[in-house]
C-alpha cells in the first residue's frame, strides 16, 4: 500500500524498507507539449527514492546486492533525454518501470520537475509511487 511507506509499515521482512536516494539529477531535455518546449531543451530535475533492503549489500559489499545508483542515474538521464516526452506523467511512469526492473528494488517514488516551465512557480512536476 502506498501509505505504508509513510507510516513505517513493516514489510514482509519485518522492518520498514531501506531507501536508496537519487536527489536532484539534472538534465536538459525536450519535455512538454508547447511548441517552444519541442524545439528547446529545458532543465529537468529527477528525484528517486528506491525502497529496498540494503543489508545484503552491507554484508557482502557487493554492488550486485543493491541498487547501483550511478548506473540508474545514467539510465534515467538517458531515458529522459532520448525520450523527448510530451508529458511528465509518461516520463515518471517509464522511470519507475526502469527502476523496478532492478531485482532489489521493491518500490520507488519518482518525482520529475521542470523548474522553468511556469515563470511564477519555482517548479512544476509530477510525483508517483509504484511498487512490485
Enumerate the language-model features and the residues they cover.
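N-terminal, polar/charged subdomain of small-to-medium soluble alpha/beta proteins
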Residues: 2-132
Amino acid at each position: 500500500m502506498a501509505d505504508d511507506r509513510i507510516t513505517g509499515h513493516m514489510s514482509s521482512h519485518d522492518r520498514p524498507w531501506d531507501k536508496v536516494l537519487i536527489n536532484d539529477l539534472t538534465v536538459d531535455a525536450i519535455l512538454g507539449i508547447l511548441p517552444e518546449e519541442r524545439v528547446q531543451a529545458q532543465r529537468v530535475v529527477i528525484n528517486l527514492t528506491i525502497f529496498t533492503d540494503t543489508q545484503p549489500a552491507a554484508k557482502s559489499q557487493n554492488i550486485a546486492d543493491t541498487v547501483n545508483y550511478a548506473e540508474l542515474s545514467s539510465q534515467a538521464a538517458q531515458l529522459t533525454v532520448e525520450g523527448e516526452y510530451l508529458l511528465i506523467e509518461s516520463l515518471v511512469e517509464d522511470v519507475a518501470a526502469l527502476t523496478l526492473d532492478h531485482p532489489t528494488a521493491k518500490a520507488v517514488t519518482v518525482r520529475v520537475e521542470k523548474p522553468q516551465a511556469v515563470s511564477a512557480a519555482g517548479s512544476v512536476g509530477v510525483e508517483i509511487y509504484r511498487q512490485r
